[in-house]
Curated annotation (Swiss-Prot):
Homotetramer. It comes from the Viruses. This is Neuraminidase. It comes from Influenza A virus (strain A/USA:Memphis/10/1996 H1N1). Substrate binds at residues 118, 152, 277-278, 293, 368. Ca(2+) binds at residues 294, 298, 324. CDD domains: Influenza_NA. It catalyses: Hydrolysis of alpha-(2->3)-, alpha-(2->6)-, alpha-(2->8)- glycosidic linkages of terminal sialic acid residues in oligosaccharides, glycoproteins, glycolipids, colominic acid and synthetic substrates. Its main location: virion. HAMAP family: INFV_NRAM. SUPFAM superfamilies: Sialidases.
Length: 470
């Protein structure tokens, strides 16, 4: 073979090898593309961790979590059929209260994006519990937090976030424009009640599964307001209480029965010497029990209980262990309003067990500071101040605020009874801490257990002032 032939042969072999290599590379690219397409399919999931997809169809909640690991989608599915919450169970027997959640939102908000809020509360479906709150349309440590001590403004909204998490724009769900609110789940969907508008013409907007279903106009034109805690659902019906009228005298109080977001019945309480505001309600053996705030003239708490036909009974907690703030020192109680230090008040709660009562209250008689739970074995009906158990929740030196009840249904817990729980708002900032320009709060929650519990203090713990305050 002469030199020219050798050169031609070597060149031909090189070209052939190059073509084969190119074909292999093209095949490799096609293979990678096809493999990726098969993995992602029509779902078109991005690489976001813990993306939650909730689909509602044929009365079944399908809850799936997609976790992307090395381009491989692992799907953990859990189907839970919707069910109407019966609400017929009695309260679980308990010996004390176990710490359930603490969101530390003020501490986190000094550096992170956390909403300025007040009036947080908790409500549970048969699948989950959520924290609801009234935001001020502002973030902590930001200029729009200035002046958020104001209760009613067009910037306030009811929102919710996963239980125990600090409420932020990244984990919160909008529910309703509102400066007074309530929410509850009937086993099929969320009912939300959001009140907004001027003092002399506010309107309550009812939503069911996020869709407006009805409105209720202020009937006295004097600051229509509702519970600031969960409403109660039983056998497909949900119940709430609203107040319209003076905060320092006799007002108008109505109970509403609501089905799938629509009012099916309402009554006005005949209670001329009573004052009901910001009621904390819970189901117990097929009835609804509400323990409320008397802002007019009672340092003990008024109550109203009613059945599903709205037949009702009213009274005041008789115990000499007084539950409101401000209040006198414990002493002789009354089954009528205890008028000593009876003006003003704070949202609170109690749980009735026969003739006994668990009373939640601030430790201070004058300031919204500290919190404790007291068991008075005869306090629902007797007027003495004897009690048999006290559990410390927040120390006297630390700020508290509103408190309220919520329950966990047997459909959630698997128990054969209704688990009683409560939350406490830990308010910081104005008007008491005047080194700040804002008012907001974090929250803690506890649930009743028939086992050992701890006495301690779980305060807010944020160091004030913030950068925006200086």
């Amino acid at each position: 073979m002469n030199p020219n032939q050798k050169i031609i042969t070597i060149g031909s072999i090189s070209i052939a090898i190059g073509i084969i290599s190119l074909i292999l590379q093209i095949g490799n690219i096609i293979s990678i593309w096809a493999s990726h397409s098969i993995q992602t399919g029509s779902q078109n999931h991005t690489g976001i961790c813990n993306q939650r997809i909730i689909t509602y169809e044929n009365s079944t909640w399908v809850n799936q979590t997609y976790v992307n690991i090395n381009n491989t989608n692992v799907v953990a599915g859990k189907d839970k059929t919707s069910m109407t919450l019966a609400g017929n169970s009695s309260l679980c027997p308990i010996r004390g209260w176990a710490i359930y959640t603490k969101d530390n939102s003020i501490r986190i908000g000094s550096k992170g994006d956390v909403f300025v809020i007040r009036e947080p509360f908790i409500s549970c479906s048969h699948l989950e519990c959520r924290t609801f709150f009234l935001t001020q349309g502002a973030l902590l440590n930001d200029k729009h937090s200035n002046g958020t001590v104001k209760d009613r403004s067009p910037y306030r909204a009811l929102m919710s976030c996963p239980l125990g998490e600090a409420p932020s724009p990244y984990n919160s769900r909008f529910e309703s424009v509102a400066w007074s609110a309530s929410a509850c789940h009937d086993g099929l969907g969320w009912l939300t009640i959001g009140i907004s508008g001027p003092d002399n013409g506010a309107v309550a907007v009812l939503k069911y599964n996020g869709i407006i279903t009805e409105t209720i106009k202020s009937w006295k034109k004097r600051i229509l307001r509702t519970q600031e805690s969960e409403c109660v659902c039983m056998n497909g019906s949900c119940f709430t209480i609203m107040t319209d009228g003076p905060s320092n005298g006799a007002a108008s109080y109505r109970i509403f029965k609501i089905e799938k977001g629509r009012v099916t019945k309402s009554i006005e309480l005949d209670a001329p010497n009573y004052h009901y505001e910001e009621c904390s309600c819970y189901p117990d053996t097929g009835t609804v029990m509400c323990v409320c705030r008397d802002n007019w003239h009672g340092s003990n708490r008024p109550w109203v209980s009613f059945n599903q036909n709205l037949d009702y009974q009213i009274g005041y907690i008789c115990s000499g262990v007084f539950g409101d703030n401000p209040r006198p020192k414990d002493g002789e109680g009354s089954c009528n309003p205890v008028t000593v230090d009876g003006a003003d008040g704070v949202k609170g709660f109690s749980y009735r067990y026969g003739n006994g009562v668990w009373i939640g209250r601030t430790k201070s008689n004058r300031l919204r500071k500290g919190f404790e739970m007291i068991w008075d074995p005869n306090g629902w009906t007797d007027t003495d101040s004897d009690f048999s158990m006290k559990q410390d929740i927040v120390a006297m030196t630390d700020w508290s605020g509103y408190s309220g009840s919520f329950v966990q249904h047997p459909e959630l817990t698997g128990l054969d009874c209704m688990r009683p729980c409560f939350w406490v708002e830990l308010v910081r900032g104005l008007p008491r801490e005047n080194t700040t320009i804002w008012t907001s709060g974090s929250s803690i929650s506890f649930c009743g257990v028939n086992s050992d519990t701890a006495n301690w203090s779980w305060p807010d713990g944020a160091e004030l002032p913030f950068t925006i305050d200086k």
